[in-house]
Amino acid sequence: MARIVLIEDSPTDQAVFTQWLTKAGHEVLVANNAEDGLQLVREHGPQLVLMDVVLPGMSGFQATRALNRDEATKGIPVIIVSTKAMDTDKAWGLRQGASDYMVKPPREEELIARINELVT
């Protein structure tokens, strides 16, 4: 079981991802924006961050970059899950330090498999 911080502003996506992750045996901490998410990461030291890109305030790209520049959090894998489906968006997310990039809506089995690969 891994502790995962979910940074997602959509209540629907929060509910779906939380259900999938808890069903897979993971503990989920949810933040509605990047600033709160970064605080959760610093306070709880998760094994993984699941991050949207389009968020109020700081974007998921900016938050991913911030996590990777901070000595205390730079080793934590980040999976970006976003509606931004262009190859340039994916490449940019990976350049910011994301471990993986998935387009919404992801398939449950694939998302859980990618998470489990990074946290085991």
PLM-predicted stretches and their roles:
Residues 8:
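Conserved acidic carboxylate
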Residues 56, 74, 86, 104:
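The feature encodes the CheY-like receiver
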Residues 44-50, 55:
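Active-site beta3 strand of CheY-like receiver
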Residues 106-116:
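C-terminal output helix
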Residues 15-23:
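Charged docking surfaces used in two-component/phosphorelay signaling
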